[in-house]
Amino acid sequence: MLALYISSGIIGGLIILYLFISFNVYWVIFHSPNKQQKKYGDFPNDPSLSQSYDLYIDLVKKLQNEKYENVYITSYDKLKLRGRYYHSNDNAPIALCFHGFRGTPIRDFCGGYQILKERGFNVLLVDERAHINSKGHTITFGVKESKDATSWINYLINRFGKDTKILLVGISMGGYIVANTIINEDIPNNVFGAILDCPYHSPIEILKHSCVNKLHIPWWLGGTLLRSAAFIFGHFSFYKEKYQLTNKLAKVNFIVIHGDNDSIVPCQFSDNLLLANKEARKYVFKGAEHGVSYLVDKELYKKCVNDFINENLK
């Protein structure tokens, strides 16, 4: 009987230890305190971009000085989500933009916004769940955020009319959010295209890359803890997302923009997305780190975006 008590105590202790470690993994990876991020966000620590810092700050200040309207929706799981709506022209197409992991829309779209404004687009910059002024404390790497994206699309159609044309734009995690949205069979025909900047094709693959190559933790251990942390404390699962994008065809045309020097989401991580649509194209920016292709070659970036809009906005 004593041996049974001892073994039960050991097993119970191991379970408590496992849950404790899983909770800490959740807190570090998936939890967000939902506080305001830095004013300008974090500028990439890349010496080759030192000459672009002034341009970056100037673009951020321009966007901060633009007039906007706070708009809100309620997510499918009852979170209040906020966005910044920038109005340029009545009856103009609308760009719906999603930022990166722990990013800010001001930082991530300070350059892209200027291109869209020049094209006469109205722009909605979304604060994703658990970021900035949107509610929630769990970042799900695009799993739940993709459902939020569909809610934002429906908001725009309900507010501006059934003939409203919508362009989806996403950077990094936002790129995956957009990609995971356009494979939805029920996506409205209002969405005429999508631009994916340095996206990953699978939450599992990007977490595995970070775990193995950056933290040097074997995946059998890291993957087990991440899945447990997400499921037990974040109330979501990303396992089924692994093959979803490559097994479904996107109804919406899209392009991928990616830097070949990306150390956060390696350039090849977006290759599988091209399998979702035979007409999709990928533009590789030489020497560009994560999320800074616009700063590396502004004119080429503008050309890629404008050519895509010209081809798909009817």
Describe the function of each predicted region.
Residues 8-74:
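An N-terminal hydrophobic leader/cap segment in hydrolases
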Residues 183-238:
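Hydrolase active-site cap/lid region
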Residues 101-115:
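The serine-hydrolase catalytic nucleophile loop
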Residues 263-269:
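Conserved alpha/beta-hydrolase "acid-adjacent" motif
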Residues 288-302:
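Catalytic histidine-centered segment of alpha/beta-hydrolase-like enzymes
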Residues 105, 131-165:
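Catalytic nucleophile-loop/oxyanion-hole region of alpha/beta-hydrolase
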Residues 116-135:
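Conserved alpha/beta-hydrolase
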Residues 249-250, 255-258, 262:
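Short beta-strand/loop motif that positions the catalytic acidic residue
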